[in-house]
A protein has these predicted regions:
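Bacterial N-terminal signal peptides
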Residues: 14-27
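Mature, soluble, non-transmembrane domains
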Residues: 112-277
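Hydrophobic/aromatic-rich structural module bridging two neighboring secondary-structure elements via a short loop
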Residues: 78-130
Length: 277
């Protein structure tokens, strides 16, 4: 799941993605046997809490997410629609369309973003990034500055590779995972330092009914996101989610410090995988 930032109101809404995928987006490398299950999911989002300083009275919205497998990589698509209601009676509406492609070896990543709202001009841009084994030095390019490369940290992760490594660490019983993560967003927000805490596997039980996509257990994961250029010890936001071994997220929360939202899975279906030679 990729983070969305709304500077006018002083907060961000995520895709882990960061998160998922931010938050919901993840990759495999050539040597890894794990495969993520292609699927399409719809999440309903609501405000959990808000400080009085935000003047927020409610947040509602929906996230439509899909993970599609291709023979040479994965395609992720996310469509957000969020409505922020304030005590003054004002309403802010944000719509975002995001799509990315990540190569199966984890070395290539491309993305496109289309964002609109009722308080800022429409925003459209795309870009791509390389990292080993495709190139010696990781770097990214953006359509708004096509002739200027953004250097990336040597050990940078793209979203899908980050989550598969996270899953591998969870399987081994490891609890902590720190990494630099590249998102498909604007250059000044494209790199975030992350600290992940991986909880003990929990029985799925009746928490999530997802048909053939339901796994016997999930890992509770919390990821804190930091600006690598800042010395602040407090994260910009934190993403907590239930991650199944097949890559499906059955529930997630995002905490921005002054307010938080959660996302309940309301619809999900498996998507076909390609037949590759």
């Amino acid at each position: 799941m990729t983070p969305l930032f709304f500077p006018k109101y002083g907060f961000a809404a995520k895709s882990l993605a960061s998160v998922v995928g931010a938050m919901l987006i993840f990759s495999i490398t050539a040597g890894q046997a794990r495969e993520l299950t292609p699927h399409k999911a719809i999440y309903e989002m609501r405000m959990m809490s808000a400080d009085s300083e935000t003047q927020l009275s409610d947040v509602t919205g929906q996230n439509e997410f899909s993970l599609t497998r291709e023979c040479d990589g994965y395609v992720v698509a996310e469509n957000y629609l969020l409505e922020f209601s304030y005590g003054s009676g004002e309403t802010a509406i944000i719509a975002s369309q995001f799509q990315s492609w990540e190569h199966i070896d984890g070395g290539l990543y491309s993305f496109s973003v289309h964002e609109g709202s009722n308080f800022e001009p429409e925003k459209k841009f795309d870009g791509y990034a390389y990292r080993p084994p495709q190139v010696a030095e990781p770097e990214a390019f953006f359509s708004m500055q096509p002739n200027s490369a953004l250097p990336l940290p040597n050990a940078v992760y793209f979203p899908l590779a980050h989550t598969l490594d996270l899953l591998d660490k969870a399987d081994k019983g490891e609890k902590l995972f720190s990494a630099d993560l590249f998102f498909g967003t604007e250059p000044d927000k494209a790199i975030r330092r992350t600290n992940s805490v991986i909880g003990k596997a929990q029985d799925t039980g009746e928490i999530a009914k997802m048909g053939s996509l339901t796994e016997p257990f999930y890992y509770p994961v919390q990821i804190a996101y930091f600006d690598p250029k800042s010395s602040e010890s407090v994260p910009e936001y934190e993403h907590t989610f239930h991650l199944q071994p097949n890559g499906v997220i059955s529930y997630y929360e995002i905490d921005y410090g002054d307010f938080s939202v959660d996302a309940q899975l309301v619809e999900i279906e498996a998507l076909p995988a390609p037949i590759c030679s």
